[in-house]
């Protein structure tokens, strides 16, 4: 029996939607509120690949109406200094093991989110575009050669970080867990549709200007090694998210040459996990940008 094609999913006010590739969204006859809940049901993404379609709408009609695709995620793991380009620009030595942290799931937000910055606590909020992995099956004590088998999908993330809070507290979780600091989406792409798992591209733009452009081929700890390391200590469960690290080009990296580089100057930040060889798609939400706006692209 042929396996169903890996779906490309969004979440709307009318439930889960499947992108068709020709500008349409098939609204599915499924009871799940988001992709994490679908995965916790225990059948991977297959139900979304084969579900009956209630009706079809143009993707353009959902501009500004897409919801967080992983709102019910229970755990978000992150890793610091995991790109060679980031290590080079900061002058830091390569870590000998992944520098892991937890990001509160309550920090999550979705496409076209406007973030209320915690200005009474932090003046140094910074963007971090990342490729995010969505776990599909329970994972514990998993060897590297079996790690990818536990990944259901990938998506884009903006691991917003209050640099000054991290510095004064010594705690990455506190600096990364303010409400809205964990944007994911806008879409979730089934792993089977990823052409090259070892080189997933990432593009981050600020006010329309490219700031971060890299691929996971530059990771210090490639995905299988990263997942295997986490699973030595933790049971990763369906719907959990693992952020793979941010490349060079954050506001912090630019501070030496641009001392005024602060979030207050960022009208919008867009993170895109692009299909290999393709140009970034237009922003889903073409309205004038507002302070602190995050746009995650399909």
What are these regions (language model features)?
Residues 2-3, 56, 60, 116, ...:
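Catalytic-pocket segment enriched in acidic/His residues
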Residues 1-98, 263-267:
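N-terminal non-catalytic cap/leader segment that marks the start of a structured domain
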Residues 21-22, 28-30, 113, 120, ...:
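Surface loops and adjacent helix of pleckstrin homology
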Residues 10, 15-17, 153, 175, ...:
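Glycine-centered structural positions embedded in regular secondary structure
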Residues 73-227, 233:
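Glycine-enriched loop-and-adjacent helix/strand subsegments that border the catalytic/binding cleft
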Residues 17, 124, 241:
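His/acidic/aromatic-lined binding-pocket segments of jelly-roll/cupin-type domains
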């Amino acid at each position: 029996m042929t396996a169903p094609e890996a779906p490309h999913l969004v979440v709307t006010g009318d439930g889960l939607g499947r992108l068709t590739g020709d500008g349409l969204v098939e609204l599915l006859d499924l009871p799940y509120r988001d992709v994490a809940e679908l995965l916790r049901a225990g059948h991977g993404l297959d139900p979304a690949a084969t579900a009956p379609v209630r009706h079809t709408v143009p993707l353009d009609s959902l501009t500004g109406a897409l919801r967080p695709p992983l709102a019910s995620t229970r755990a978000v793991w992150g890793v610091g200094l995991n790109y060679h380009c980031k290590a080079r620009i900061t002058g830091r030595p390569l870590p000998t093991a992944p520098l892991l942290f937890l990001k509160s799931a309550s920090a999550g937000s979705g496409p076209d989110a406007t973030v209320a910055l915690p200005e009474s606590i932090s003046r140094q909020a910074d963007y971090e575009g990342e490729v995010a992995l969505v776990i599909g099956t329970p994972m514990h004590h998993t060897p590297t050669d079996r790690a990818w088998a536990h990944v259901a999908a990938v998506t884009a993330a903006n691991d917003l970080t209050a640099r000054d809070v991290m510095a004064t507290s010594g705690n990455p979780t506190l600096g990364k867990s303010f409400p809205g600091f964990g944007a994911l989406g806008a879409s979730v792409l089934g792993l089977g549709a990823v052409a090259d798992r070892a080189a997933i591209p990432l593009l981050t733009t600020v006010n329309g200007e490219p700031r971060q452009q890299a691929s996971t081929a530059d990771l210090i700890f490639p995905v299988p090694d990263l997942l295997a390391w986490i699973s030595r200590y933790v049971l990763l469960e369906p719907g959990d998210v693992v952020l793979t690290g941010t490349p060079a080009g954050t506001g912090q990296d630019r501070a030496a040459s641009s001392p005024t580089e602060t979030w207050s100057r960022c009208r919008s930040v867009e993170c895109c996990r692009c299909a290999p060889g393709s140009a970034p798609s237009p922003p889903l939400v073409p309205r004038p940008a507002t302070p602190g706006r995050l746009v995650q692209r399909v």
